[in-house]
Design a protein with these regions (language model features):
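ATP/NTP phosphate-donor binding region
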Residues: 1-65, 72, 111-115, 274, ...
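Hydrophobic alpha-helical membrane segments, chiefly transmembrane helices and signal peptide h-regions
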Residues: 11-14, 63-67, 74-75, 89-94, ...
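Short, glycine/charged-enriched secondary-structure capping and boundary segments
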Residues: 26-28, 77-80, 104-107
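Soluble catalytic domains of membrane acyltransferases
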Residues: 49-55, 76, 80, 130-131
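Short solvent-exposed loop/turn micro-motifs enriched in small/polar/acidic residues
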Residues: 57, 120-122, 181-183, 234-236, ...
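Short Gly/Thr/Asp-enriched flexible loops that form oxyanion-binding sites at enzyme active sites
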Residues: 69-83
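Catalytic core of DAGKc-family lipid kinases
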Residues: 83-207, 211
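ATP/nucleoside-binding phosphotransfer catalytic cores, i.e., glycine-rich phosphate-binding loops
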Residues: 201-280
Length: 280
C-alpha cells in the first residue's frame, strides 16, 4: 500500500447532491482538507462539469465529496478514458447512499474520512467490467428493484465537451426513486468461467456477484426458487460471469441497467486505487 504525504495537492470535487443533502458535512470536509493539504475546491453544477473538472485534474489527487453515485461516476469516467489505473481516488462520503463506500473501507463520518484522505494509504481494488464498458465497484444484483425510470440530462454541443458527450450522457442518467419490491422469479443461465452454474430450467429468485474475492476472483451466489423449504444457494467463484435468458435488469452498485438478454462481467484485478485509513 502506498502512503500519502500532507504536501500532496488535492482536487476536492463536491458533488451538487452532497451540498443539497448535508451542507454541514461538506463544510467540515472542506475545512479539514484545506487545513491539512494544498486543496483546490471545485463545486460542479452537474455531471458534465463534474467530468470536466476531473479531466483537468493534472497532478492533483482527486477527492470526491458525495455519495456512492458520485464515486461510481468518477470511477466510470476514468475507466472509460483509460486513466483509472494511474489515478488514486479518495472520498468523503456525504449523502444518502453510502453503502458501497463503507463496504470498500471508507469511513462514513466526514471528519474521519477527511483525515483518511490526508493520512491514509492506497488500497488497490478489483473491478467488474461488463461487455458494454460498465463497471461494478461493490455488488451486482439480479433482479434489481421492480420499477425504475431514468432521466437523461441534456448536454451542450460545443466546446470542451464534444469528445466526451456520449460518455457524460451515459453517466448523467440517474434512476428515479423506486419502491423496494422484489421482481418475479427469472429463468436465467449463469456461467462462471464458461461452466454452467444454473440453467434455464431452474427459476431463480436472485443472483449476486461481488468482486474482491480471494485470488482476484468474483464471488457468485445464485438463489434458486424454492417451494416450501428454503433452497440452498449455489455459490461459485471465477474471473468471468455470464448471465443470459429472457430480458432482465440488474443493479450495479447504485444504478440500474437493462433490459438485456445477455451480459458478461470480467474481473480486473487491482484495477483502481482508493485511499483508506492506515492500519495504525
Amino acid at each position: 500500500m502506498a502512503t500519502f504525504a500532507r504536501s500532496d495537492q488535492l482536487l476536492v470535487i463536491i458533488d451538487p447532491a452532497a451540498r443539497e443533502t448535508d451542507g454541514e458535512s461538506v463544510r467540515i470536509a472542506k475545512d479539514v482538507l484545506s487545513a491539512g493539504a494544498a486543496a483546490k475546491v471545485c463545486m460542479p453544477d452537474g455531471p458534465e462539469e463534474f467530468a470536466r473538472v476531473l479531466s483537468r485534474r493534472g497532478s492533483r489527487r482527486p477527492v470526491v465529496v458525495g455519495d456512492d453515485g458520485a464515486l461510481v461516476r468518477a470511477v466510470t469516467f476514468l475507466h472509460r478514458r483509460r486513466e483509472l489505473a494511474d489515478c488514486v481516488l479518495a472520498m468523503v462520503p456525504v449523502g444518502g447512499a453510502l453503502g458501497v463506500a463503507h463496504a470498500l473501507g471508507v469511513p462514513t463520518g466526514a471528519v474521519a474520512a477527511a483525515r483518511a484522505v490526508l493520512d491514509g494509504v492506497e488500497r488497490r481494488m478489483d473491478l467488474l467490467v461488463d461487455d458494454s464498458d460498465g463497471v461494478v465497484l461493490g455488488a451486482l444484483r439480479i433482479p434489481p428493484l421492480a420499477a425504475v425510470a431514468q432521466v437523461q440530462v441534456p448536454l451542450p454541443a460545443k466546446g470542451w465537451l464534444r469528445p466526451y458527450q456520449h460518455l457524460v450522457r451515459s453517466l448523467s442518467a440517474r434512476p428515479a426513486p423506486a419502491p423496494a419490491v422484489p421482481g418475479p422469479p427469472a429463468r436465467l443461465r449463469v456461467e462462471v468461467d464458461g461452466e454452467t452454474v444454473v440453467d434455464l430450467d431452474q427459476p431463480v429468485e436472485g443472483i449476486s456477484v461481488t468482486p474482491g474475492g480471494p485470488d482476484g476472483l468474483a464471488e457468485v451466489e445464485v438463489r434458486p426458487l424454492s417451494v416450501g423449504a428454503e433452497a440452498t444457494p449455489v455459490r461459485a467463484a471465477g474471473r468471468t460471469v455470464t448471465v443470459a435468458g429472457a430480458d432482465f435488469r440488474y443493479r450495479a452498485d447504485v444504478g440500474v441497467a437493462g433490459p438485456v438478454r445477455r451480459r458478461t462481467w470480467r474481473v480486473v484485478e487491482g484495477a483502481w486505487g482508493l485511499t483508506v485509513p492506515g492500519a495504525g
